[in-house]
Swiss-Prot record:
This is DNA gyrase inhibitor YacG. Zn(2+) binds at residues 3, 6, 18, 22. It comes from Ruegeria pomeroyi (strain ATCC 700808 / DSM 15171 / DSS-3) (Silicibacter pomeroyi). Inhibits all the catalytic activities of DNA gyrase by preventing its interaction with DNA. Acts by binding directly to the C-terminal domain of GyrB, which probably disrupts DNA binding by the gyrase. Keywords: Metal-binding, Plasmid, Zinc.
Amino acid sequence: MTCPICGSKTAPSYRPFCSKRCADLDLAKWLNGSYAIPASSEDEEEPLDQEAETPVAPRH
C-alpha cells in the first residue's frame, strides 16, 4: 500500500500514510475544505423552524 499524499510505502503507525507529516497534510486538506463529500438534496436537513414544532420538556 502506498501513501495517498506522496506515494511512499506506508508506515504501520501512520497507516494509510507514510509519516506524521503526510497524515497532517491530509488532515489540513479536510480542515480547509479541499476535500468535500458531496450531498444530494435528499440528505439536506429540515429547516430549524420546522424542528422547533416538537415540544421540549422543561428543564429542572
